[in-house]
Regions:
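Catalytic-loop region of hydrolases
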Residues: 1-44, 58
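N-terminal cap/lid subdomain of alpha/beta-hydrolase-fold enzymes
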Residues: 29, 38-102
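Conserved acidic catalytic loop of the alpha/beta-hydrolase fold
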Residues: 106-108, 112, 119-138
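Conserved hydrolase catalytic core segment
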Residues: 136-176
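Alpha/beta-hydrolase-fold enzymes
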Residues: 160-243
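Short beta-strand/loop motif that positions the catalytic acidic residue
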Residues: 273, 279-281
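Conserved alpha/beta-hydrolase "acid-adjacent" motif
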Residues: 286-292
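Catalytic active-site module of serine/aspartate enzymes centered on a nucleophile-bearing elbow/loop
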Residues: 304-336
Length: 336
């Protein structure tokens, strides 16, 4: 299977709240071949505002592309593993979410899309994988918000997961990330229209401004300083990328996905984990800053664990930019 994004119906899905989503569609990419016994799969999870194209060399995500880590002989070895990356439930890149059509109305779900949890996101991923024939995961791994999913997986499906890796991530949701805070920021915009902005052309300017702020916070400007000496050229490139994202992402997804992570906290459940654990943090990272107490907690877990602190000027972007420094860690997670 190649780099094209595919879409698969997994049927109706009942959320943790008890509400039922009809005919959930899941967008995903897959690389490599699934073994006859279905046990050679690896799930790569994506971040808060990105999607399955994080594995594409031409894609720019907030956490950086993982394309250099994917391929024959690389840590995400397509000769050995069946690599899947699916768009999260509630996101904006092909999976059922606020920008997809509500069958009951024929219109985008918009603000009527139900609240979801991280367990729902992982549950939909599980349904996709089992529909594809996967019976076991050699690893679940991803950066930032994706690392929270990777931690949730061995708690929710302990018998299915061999290893879990969280890169530039944490054991709780990011401080300050909440559905209420995101909704309040968006509601201040004249593009909001009471949340019914789909009928008014969306929120392109608001999302563009938010994306510019986010990418600067993540360290993208620092990266571009090393690549482009001309400040005007750097700003133009940053603006183009942020404008492109703003044209494709749905503002309601910011609210839905923030809400999904609010209750995430595995600090008191580390003793339940039986999967091999990798935890990589970066200094400095304004989103998930390293914390000695978290490092001690990870290292004290009962399965084999590896806690690594990278010193990088690229902050939260180190997940993709510093991919060479991640190679050894991912090979530990996925040993030959």
């Amino acid at each position: 299977m190649g780099t094209d994004i595919r879409t698969l119906s997994i049927g109706p899905y009942t959320l943790a709240s008890g509400l039922r989503l009809p005919d959930v569609q899941v967008a995903y990419v897959a690389h490599g071949q699934l073994a006859p016994d279905g046990r050679n799969a690896v799930l790569v999870t994506h971040g808060y505002t990105s999607g399955p194209s994080m594995l594409s060399p031409s894609h720019h995500t907030a956490e950086g592309s993982w394309a250099p880590l994917l391929g024959p002989g690389r840590p995400l070895d397509t000769d050995r593993y069946f690599i899947v990356c699916s768009n999260m439930l509630g996101s904006s890149f092909g999976t059922t979410g606020p920008n997809t059509v509500n069958p009951a109305t024929g219109q985008p779900w918009g603000p009527d899309f139900p609240a979801i949890t991280l367990a729902d996101i992982v549950g939909v991923q599980h349904r996709l994988l089992t529909t594809l024939g996967v019976t076991h995961l050699q690893a679940v791994v991803g950066p930032s918000y994706a690392g929270c999913q990777a931690r949730q997986w061995p708690l929710q499906y302990p018998a299915m997961v061999e290893a879990a890796g969280a890169i530039v991530s944490g054991l709780t949701h990011p401080p300050g990330l909440s559905a209420a805070a995101q909704r309040a920021r968006l509601a201040d915009s004249p593009e909001w229209h009471g949340g019914r902005f789909h009928a008014h052309g969306g929120m392109p300017e608001t999302l563009f401004a938010l994306r510019m702020q986010t990418m600067r916070q993540y360290g993208l400007e620092r990266l571009y300083q090393d690549l482009l000496p001309d400040p005007a050229e750097r700003q133009a490139l940053l603006a183009r990328q942020c404008r492109d994202w703003a044209s494709r992402f749905d503002a309601h997804s910011l609210v839905v996905l923030a809400g999904a992570a609010e209750a995430f906290d595995v600090r008191h459940r580390m003793d339940e984990l039986r999967a091999r654990l990798l935890f990589v943090v970066c200094t400095p990272d304004p989103i998930f800053p390293p914390a000695p107490a978290i490092g001690r907690l990870v290292r004290s877990a009962s399965p084999p664990t590896r806690h690594v602190e990278l010193d990088s000027p690229y902050g939260h972007m180190a997940s993709g930019v510093e991919w060479r420094r991640l190679e050894a860690e991912l090979r530990w997670l996925l040993p030959a």
